[in-house]
């Protein structure tokens, strides 16, 4: 696990929940994260990550939340605020525009070796999905993570990945929170304690040029 983070054959991007419903101005959840998205210029930075990954031939693994469809949460006994909000808003509705990946961030499976993993139900893109299996099949050891939301799905996935033995880098301006304060608390206070590296997108892309 000592190879540099930018070692392309052993490194992958994990991009979490880049759905229209989250990061497009017309998305169902956009209003909840718009302040933080604007403050961090998140969408531009996510596109910068994808562009840099393509140029460096680093595969992107897409960790996506389960799409909503009628009956998804029927008889669930352990709903939390997140699942309740998704149920009531019908965010990421199956087959809808909102459940599509934002234009410019779409996977390139054949050209870049990107992988769309099975969808997560709660916060971690590892729990109840095939992400770990897919990474092991390709002998990936280093993960660079970005996406939504800073202190929920992104952070939870990073924590889980670290527990599984991956070298994890988090990109501070490739994400957003339900408020700028919540996002900043995650990136400034929590992340440095739980992962291997915390960087801006610009700092990370600079390492690819060295």
Regions found by a protein language model. Give the residues of each.
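A short alpha/beta connector and helix-capping loop motif
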Residues: 9-11, 26-53, 57-62
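Catalytic-core segment of enzymes that process non-peptidic bonds
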Residues: 62-71, 77
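Short connector loops/turns at beta-strand edges and beta->alpha or beta->beta junctions
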Residues: 18-23, 28
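Active-site-adjacent betaalpha module
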Residues: 1-12, 21, 48-56, 73-74, ...
């Amino acid at each position: 696990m000592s190879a540099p983070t930018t070692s392309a054959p052993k490194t992958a991007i994990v991009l979490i929940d880049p759905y229209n419903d989250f990061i497009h101005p017309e998305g169902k959840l956009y209003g909840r994260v718009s302040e933080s998205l604007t403050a961090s210029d998140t969408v531009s930075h996510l596109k910068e990550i994808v562009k840099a990954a393509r140029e460096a031939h680093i595969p992107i693994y897409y960790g996506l939340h389960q799409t909503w469809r009628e009956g998804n949460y029927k008889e669930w006994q352990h709903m939390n605020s997140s699942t309740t909000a998704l149920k009531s808003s019908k965010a990421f509705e199956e087959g809808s525009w909102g459940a599509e990946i934002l234009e410019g961030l779409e996977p390139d499976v054949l050209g870049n070796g990107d992988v769309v993993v099975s969808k997560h139900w709660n916060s971690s893109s590892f729990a109840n999905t095939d992400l770990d299996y897919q990474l092991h099949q390709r002998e990936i050891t280093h993960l660079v993570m970005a996406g939504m939301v800073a202190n929920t799905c992104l952070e939870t996935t990073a924590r889980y990945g670290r527990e599984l033995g991956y070298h994890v880098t988090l990109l501070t301006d490739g994400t957003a929170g339900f408020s700028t304060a919540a996002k900043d608390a995650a990136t400034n206070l929590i992340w440095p304690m739980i992962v291997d590296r915390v960087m801006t997108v610009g700092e990370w892309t600079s390492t690819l040029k060295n």
